[in-house]
Amino acid sequence: MIRILVLMITFTLMTGSALCSIEQLMRVFGGGSVGGGSRLDINRRVTIVPPEGELSFGYGFRPGFY
C-alpha cells in the first residue's frame, strides 16, 4: 500500500512539472500571455500557431501562406 502511495505522489509531481513546462513554452510562443497570436515559421513553409482561446487544445499546423 505504501509503495502505491509513493508511486502516485511521484507520478503527480512528475506530471505537474511537465505541465508547468508546457505552460512556459506556451508563454514563450504566445508573447508572454496565454492564448497569444504569435507565429513561429519553420523554413517559411509551416507556421505553428498557438491556441487562440483559453478553451483551445493543441497546436494548429498550416501552410505559411495563410
Swiss-Prot record:
GO terms for cellular component: extracellular region; extracellular space. Its main location: secreted. It is found in: Secreted. Specifically expressed in the ejaculatory bulb and seminal fluid. One of its GO terms (biological process) is sexual reproduction. Protein component of the posterior mating plug. This is Ejaculatory bulb-specific protein 2.
